[in-house]
Every structure is written in structure tokens, then in C-alpha cells.
Swiss-Prot record:
Keywords: Hydrolase. InterPro entries: dGTPase, Diverse_Catalytic_Enzymes, dNTPase_2, HD/PDEase_dom, HD_domain, PHydrolase_assoc_dom. It comes from Wolinella succinogenes (strain ATCC 29543 / DSM 1740 / CCUG 13145 / JCM 31913 / LMG 7466 / NCTC 11488 / FDC 602W). It comes from the Bacteria. The keyword Hydrolase applies. SMART domains: HDc. This is Deoxyguanosinetriphosphate triphosphohydrolase-like protein. NCBIfam families: dGTP_triPase, PRK01286.1-1. PANTHER family: BIS(5'-NUCLEOSYL)-TETRAPHOSPHATASE, SYMMETRICAL, SLR1885 PROTEIN.
Length: 365
């Protein structure tokens, strides 16, 4: 298939193909539910914390800026970025890990993967047309959703779909840009959220070269650490610095300007896009610090422990009592749908708040 083509013919309008993709994503119910899904901190913890929705918007802004600088297709990058987290479960990665464990326990060997679930949302679960499932997005956007993060999960697709989406090859350069924009956004903004709510201090991260350099830069701007604006200047400088580090390592990509595909580069070969070696080294150290200092903070662990328990209980409830499911999902099972797959789709679609309220309704009353 050509990048701009769709699996189902549909009347085109005045927009370009990737603008239509972006608009369909923004208007779908799964996108709206991202407002109440956890990034790192549970949504109920405070209205300041970033959610999957705000994160997706931030990723799309960074991805568009990078794509523009490299002469790539900005709108395709935006569409992939806005949809890249549609498949996330409630309670962040802890929820996804628990659903993965439960699916494997019930005989679904491939388990759960949020990238594939995002693909499943836009290609099957969203119901927008009378004659086919999904949002009918272009091939390039679907491929970017499926393959924006390496390694690619071949076990989720049949042989025909593996061949169509060429999982032995890298995706478009725009999809690779989104993967790195995602990394830039979550590292910077998780630090921001963590500091805001007292889970970490900048001093806890100063052994990171990146953090030290950005602290120095903010101080050189005449901002004192005691000032509220210091955190904003630090985060802004960190994002800019990471973007420049990516652009510095991606000059070769200019040779591919105007192309949507990545010239079918085998997945084991080096890409023309990526952080410079120095920036890659610094970022790796910072992420390691964040893992120990923030992502494994006791308050985060407690919330994630609750989230895993909530998903586990709901999954077992629905598997044991199918009549607890919405009628349309009961019908899917009665018509031959695999119960564990139907239940997983349902739970993955829930917001944090909905999952917590349903858990309380079934177990506390």
C-alpha cells in the first residue's frame, strides 16, 4: 500500500490525508478518555498532574517542531503522536503489566502491549462507519502507531498483516520522530510533576549532567532556585536541549526530505534519526536516576499497587461473571469472541476514575 492509502475507500474532502487522520483521532471517544488516564501519578492525586491526554498533546507539539525542522511531514507526525497512547490501560504502565500477566495466565500467549492496543483501537474497536470497523486511517498513520516504538510485536498480527506492515523494517521517519518526542516529553514533564508535588527535588537529580547543565542555564538567566519560575525555566531549557540533541544526531535524515517511508530500512540497521551520542549517554543516565528516585518512589508504588489490584479484580470478576459486562460485550462473546480478549479491551478502555468506581461498586458496595 502507498502511505496515503486507506484499507476502505471513502469520499475525500478538502483536507490532506493525514489531516483527516488527525481530525478523526481527535474526535474519537478513546482520545477523550485519555483526559482521565494516568501518565505516572494517579489522576485522582491532583488536577495539576499530567494525564495521557496532556502528554499526547505535548508529544504532538514536539514531534511537529522536529518534523518541520527536518523537512518531514508535520501532519503525519502529529497524527501518530496524538494516537500513540490510545491503547494505554488505566493506572499507567502498572495497569498494562497486570493486564499482560492476566492475558498470558488465561492462555493468550502474546499478552498485552499498549502499542498494539492503540492500533487495535483505531483499526477495530472505534465504531464510526456502518460497513467497517475502526477509523479508516491511512496506511502511514496505522504503521506509525504500530511501529513507533521498537521492538515491534510480531506475535499480535497474523502473517498477512505482518507482511503488509513489514515488521522486519523500520517505520516512516515521522514515526521515529514521534518515538523520540515521546521520550523528550515524558522525561521533562515527569520531573516537573515530581517536583511540583514534592516527590523529588532537583538536588536529587544533580548527579545527572543534563540536570546540572539545565540548572546552571536557568541560574544564568538570573532566576533563583527559590523562585517558582525556576522550575518552568528548567523544564523549558531541558526540552529545548533534548530537541537540539536529537536534531544534531539526525542531520542525515535531511537526505530523506519529502519521503514518508524510511526507504524500508531493516529493523536491525542504524537509522538516520536519533540523539547524538553525547546526548544519548546523558539521557540514559538521567532516565536511570528517574527510575530509582521517582518511578519507584513509595507514593507512586502504593498507587500502582492499588491499580494492579483493581485491574486484577475486575478482570477476574468479568471472566467469572460475564453478565457483569455491558450487553454489547456479552453479545460479542456469545457470537464467538474470545472472552479474555473482550474483557481486556473493555478494561483497557477505562479511565482511572471509571475503573476505581466500578471496583468499589463491585467489591465495596
Amino acid at each position: 500500500m502507498r502511505p496515503h492509502e486507506r484499507f476502505h475507500d471513502f469520499l475525500d474532502d478538502f483536507r490532506n490525508p493525514y489531516s483527516r487522520d488527525r481530525d478523526r483521532i481527535i474526535h474519537c471517544s478513546s482520545f477523550r478518555r485519555l483526559e482521565y488516564k494516568t501518565q505516572v501519578f494517579l489522576n485522582s492525586s491532583g488536577d495539576y498532574f499530567r494525564t495521557r491526554l496532556t502528554h499526547s498533546i505535548e508529544v504532538s507539539q514536539i514531534a511537529r517542531s522536529i518534523a518541520s525542522h527536518l523537512g518531514l511531514n508535520e501532519t503525519l507526525a502529529e497524527a501518530i503522536a496524538l494516537s500513540h497512547d490510545l491503547g494505554h490501560t488505566p493506572f499507567g504502565h502498572a495497569g498494562g503489566d497486570e493486564l499482560d500477566r492476566l492475558l498470558k495466565k488465561h492462555g493468550f500467549e502474546a499478552g498485552f502491549d499498549h502499542n498494539f492496543q492503540s492500533f487495535r483501537v483505531v483499526s477495530k474497536l472505534e465504531k464510526r462507519y456502518p460497513n467497517f470497523e475502526g477509523l479508516n486511517l491511512t496506511f502511514a498513520t496505522l504503521e506509525g502507531i504500530l511501529k513507533h516504538s521498537y521492538p515491534y510485536q510480531k506475535s499480535f498480527l497474523d502473517a498477512a498483516m505482518n507482511e503488509i506492515f513489514a515488521l522486519d523494517y523500520h517505520p516512516s521517519l515521522e514515526a521515529i520522530v514521534v518515538d523520540h518526542a515521546d521520550e523528550i516529553a515524558y522525561v521533562s514533564h515527569d520531573i516537573d510533576d515530581g517536583i511540583k508535588y514534592g516527590l523529588i527535588r532537583l538536588e536529587d537529580l544533580e548527579e545527572s549532567e543534563l540536570v546540572g547543565e539545565m540548572i546552571d542555564k536557568a541560574e544564568q538567566e538570573g532566576v533563583k532556585r527559590s523562585e517558582k519560575v525556576f522550575r518552568y525555566r528548567f523544564v523549558s531549557n531541558l526540552i529545548n536541549h533534548l530537541v537540539y540533541g536529537f536534531l544534531e544526531g539526525s542531520q542525515e535524515a535531511r537526505l530523506h526530505q519529502g519521503e514518508v517511508r524510511s526507504a524500508m530500512i531493516p529493523s536491525g540497521e542504524r537509522l538516520p534519526l536519533g540523539f547524538s551520542p553525547e546526548m544519548g549517554r546523558k539521557l540514559k543516565k538521567l532516565k536511570k536516576l528517574l527510575f530509582t528516585k521517582l518511578y519507584r518512589h513509595e507514593q507512586v508504588n502504593r498507587k500502582m499497587f492499588f491499580g494492579r489490584g483493581c485491574i486484577r479484580a475486575l478482570f477476574e470478576d468479568f471472566m467469572n461473571e460475564k453478565n457483569l459486562l455491558p450487553k454489547e460485550l456479552q453479545e460479542r462473546i456469545n457470537q464467538g469472541g474470545k472472552a479474555h480478549r473482550v474483557v481486556a479491551d473493555y478494561i483497557a478502555s477505562m479511565s482511572d476514575r471509571y475503573a476505581m468506581n466500578l471496583y468499589k461498586e463491585l467489591h465495596i458496595g
